[in-house]
Structures are given as structure tokens and as C-alpha cells.
């Protein structure tokens, strides 16, 4: 989103600075923890949603695009934390919310969105699809306002049911303070930040993950692609080199460790090193957020011979670390062994920063890690994935790339295992 919009007085936590940012982040992190973030409660919620997702996936006998179902599942986890409820996948308001989020993510990552970010005063007067960003944004604000109004009607002060109630309690406590950072517009924008940051990025990671597994079935089940099939991924020049003694494949590992009689849990992650490595390598390779959000230096700074005056806007390019051959062998290749040691145990890498780093890293990083792992492992436990074209013909070139990398549209078949 343009800095001209996001730096407005009613901006939420994502683009705030100084004491305002610290105040909003402290409340938001506290409220999210109170609502179960990082606890068994939120894990149970994700496991339940993963089961609901698989039930929906299993109803598709013909090839289908998984985008909507994956967005539904991911967003429902956010809805449970923020609004205290989940939606039916057929709910029209829920569908509208997700369509607006998806449309804005694509628009902001388009050439039109990037042009607006660079020349907002000019692009304000230029007709084009970028103008739809602001219309969508107002519809999203109206959706959130409606939920807040319903909460105000039903809440009990001091007995928060969800994030919105926690924020409303704080607004009530500081209503006499003219300098308070807690007011209705900051609640609306912070809620919008949580939805925007926690829905499209996670669902795009899952969509890209399934697409990669369709292209390389040997990763999933151990069955190789057709003999002599090229390893290159058209458009990105990526390939998949396997060592001669490759680790157990994902479904084999899940079957051995988890079995078929219960759902995967976070406690299984340490016992699924290859699966965990595949999840990390998917995130590294596709780089759903290749750049971090714009930041500003708070004082005059000298960096590698360059002088950055106070207030200079900077944008970290995290994808540069993911393509660094010092950090990752064959960085243009999809290779899960980037996250495995010589004995096949999982190995972390400090250059892996899908949720940014430092004090301003993604608020929902822990939640996103849980969702990506549990959704993917549950899907692979329950289904065999089948592409609608030859694996070697699958193209991983992003549909759009700028703020975010979006996977190209595709269809797949799922067969119960």
C-alpha cells in the first residue's frame, strides 16, 4: 500500500513508528497471547480447521483450483483469534472479504501498484486498476467496522472473548486520555493489518507448496517423475537435485511417525526432519515476500560507505539472502537438503527470514509457522496429489511479483490415501 495511505493518522501497527508503534505492538502481542497464540489452544484450532479443509478437498472428484479453499482455512484461523468465530466456506460475506484481500494483494504487487508507490501524486489522477485498491480498502474497513459494532453490542467489559474485545477494553480504559493511541480507527487498521498480513502470505505459501510437490512427486511419495524429465522450472531456472541416498520422502515419513489414525501435531515436527526441511525449502525458494515492508532510519546513519539521513526510507531485500550461494548450496534449486545435516537431521539457517527479523518482524510469525506445517502435513497425510499435466510441464513462474510473489493459477486432483 502507498505510504501516503499507510502513514495516515489512523494507520495501524504495520506502518506506525516510535511510541505509537510500541504501544500498539505491546497490546496486540498481549491480546494474541491471551487468545491462545503460541499455546495448545490455537494449535487445536488449526488442527480442527485442517480437518475441515481436508473434508472440503475430499469432496472434489474433478480437478480444481485450491486457492479459495486454502484462503478459507487460513483466514478462518485469523477470524477465530480476531473475531472469535469461524465462517462457513460458503458464507457470502466471508467470500467477499477474501476476494477483497486477494485483489488488493495482487494490485499492490502489480506494475500499477508499484507505480503508485513511486509517484502517488501523479497516479492519483491516472485512471487504472490501481484505483480499485482504495475502493477495496474502504469495503474492508466497512466489514471490520461492522464486526466491531456487533462486538460493542454483545461484549462484557473486562471479559474479552477475542482480539477485538481486548482492544475495546483498552479504548474504554483510556477514553479520557486525549493522547491515547487506542481509538476506533487504530483498531480498524490494526485488524486490517492482521488480516492482510496473515491471510494472503500464508495461503500463497501453501498454494506454492502444493504446486512444487505436484512438480516433484518424488518429494512427496518417493515415486519419480517420468524418466528423463527435465529438472528445470520454466521461468525461474530452478531444479531439484537429489543426493544418491536421499532422505525419506514426506508421506513415508508422516506415515512412519504419525500414522493414519490421528492428525499431525506440532510435537511431531522434531520427529519429521525431512518434512520440516521441505516446508522450509518451499518458503525459501518461492519467497512469498521477497521484500520487507518499507522502514525509515531513525537517525543519520553510515552504512557500507553510504550516508543515510534520518528519515530515509529503506526496503530490505530478503530474497537476496535466499539466493546467496554462501548460505545455500545451489540457491536457484529446490533442494530440501539445504535444511538437513549430514545425518539427515533438521538444520536451521540464520539466513532464512521469511517473516523478517528484529523487533519489527511479523507479529504472526509463530501462527504462520504452525499453519503452514499443520495444513501441509495434514493434507499429505490424507491425500495423494495428482497434477493435471506432466510434472515437467508445470511452470512455477509467479503470476505477479513485487510486494509478494503469487503462484500461477493451477488445478490438481486429490485422491484419498
Please report, for each region that a protein language model flagged, where it lies by residue.
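Conserved cytochrome P450 catalytic core segment spanning the I/J/K helices
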Residues: 33-37, 110, 135-206, 228-239, ...
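Cytochrome P450 catalytic-core helices
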Residues: 201-219, 234-243, 251-253, 366-381
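Conserved cytochrome P450 K-helix/beta-meander segment immediately N-terminal to the heme-binding cysteine loop
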Residues: 221, 269, 316-343
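Cytochrome P450 heme-thiolate "Cys pocket" and heme-binding signature region
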Residues: 304, 342-372, 397-399
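Cytochrome P450
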Residues: 36-48, 57-80, 88-96, 119-143, ...
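Conserved cytochrome P450 K-helix E-x-x-R motif and the immediately C-terminal K′/meander segment
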Residues: 139-142, 242, 247, 263-305, ...
Amino acid at each position: 500500500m502507498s505510504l501516503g495511505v499507510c502513514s495516515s493518522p489512523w494507520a495501524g501497527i504495520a506502518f506506525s513508528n516510535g511510541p505509537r508503534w510500541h504501544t500498539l505492538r505491546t497490546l496486540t502481542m498481549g491480546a494474541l497471547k491471551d487468545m491462545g497464540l503460541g499455546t495448545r489452544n490455537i494449535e487445536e484450532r488449526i488442527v480442527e480447521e485442517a480437518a475441515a479443509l481436508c473434508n472440503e478437498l475430499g469432496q472434489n472428484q474433478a480437478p480444481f483450483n485450491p486457492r479459495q479453499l486454502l484462503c478459507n482455512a487460513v483466514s478462518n484461523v485469523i477470524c477465530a483469534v480476531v473475531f472469535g468465530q469461524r465462517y462457513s466456506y460458503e458464507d457470502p460475506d466471508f467470500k467477499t472479504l477474501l476476494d477483497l484481500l486477494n485483489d488488493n494483494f495482487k494490485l499492490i504487487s502489480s506494475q500499477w501498484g508499484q507505480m503508485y508507490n513511486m509517484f502517488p501524486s501523479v497516479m492519483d489522477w491516472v485512471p487504472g486498476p490501481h484505483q480499485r485498491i482504495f475502493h477495496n480498502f474502504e469495503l474492508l474497513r466497512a466489514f471490520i467496522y461492522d464486526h466491531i459494532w456487533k462486538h460493542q453490542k454483545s461484549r462484557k467489559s473486562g471479559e474479552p472473548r477475542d482480539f477485538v474485545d481486548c482492544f475495546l477494553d483498552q479504548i474504554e480504559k483510556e477514553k479520557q486520555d486525549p493522547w491515547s493511541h487506542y481509538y476506533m480507527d487504530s483498531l480498524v487498521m490494526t485488524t486490517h493489518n492482521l488480516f492482510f498480513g496473515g491471510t494472503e502470505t500464508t495461503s500463497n505459501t501453501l498454494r506454492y507448496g502444493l504446486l512444487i510437490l505436484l512438480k516433484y512427486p518424488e518429494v512427496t511419495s518417493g515415486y519419480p517423475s517420468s524418466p528423463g524429465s527435465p529438472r528445470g522450472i520454466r521461468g525461474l531456472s530452478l531444479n531439484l537435485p537429489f543426493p544418491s541416498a536421499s532422505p525419506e520422502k514426506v508421506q513415508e515419513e508422516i506415515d512412519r511417525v504419525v500414522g493414519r489414525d490421528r492428525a499431525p501435531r506440532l510435537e511431531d515436527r522434531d520427529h519429521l526432519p525431512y518434512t520440516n526441511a521441505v516446508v522450509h525449502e518451499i518458503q525459501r525458494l518461492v519467497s512469498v515476500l521477497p521484500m520487507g515492508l518499507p522502514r525509515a532510519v531513525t537517525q543519520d546513519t553510515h552504512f557500507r560507505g553510504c550516508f543515510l539521513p534520518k528519515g530515509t526510507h529503506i526496503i530490505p531485500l530478503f530474497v537476496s539472502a535466499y539466493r546467496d550461494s554462501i548460505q545455500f548450496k545451489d540457491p536457484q534449486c529446490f533442494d530440501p537438503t539445504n535444511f538437513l545435516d549430514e545425518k539427515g537431521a533438521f538444520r536451521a539457517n540464520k539466513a532464512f527470514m521469511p517473516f523478517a527479523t528484529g523487533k519489527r518482524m511479523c507479529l504472526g510469525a509463530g501462527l504462520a509457522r504452525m499453519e503452514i506445517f499443520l495444513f501441509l502435513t495434514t493434507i499429505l497425510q490424507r491425500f495423494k496429489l495428482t497434477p493435471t499435466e506432466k510434472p515437467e510441464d508445470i511452470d512455477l513462474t509467479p503470476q505477479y511479483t513485487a510486494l509478494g510473489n503469487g503462484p500461477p493459477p493451477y488445478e490438481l486432483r486429490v485422491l484419498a490415501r
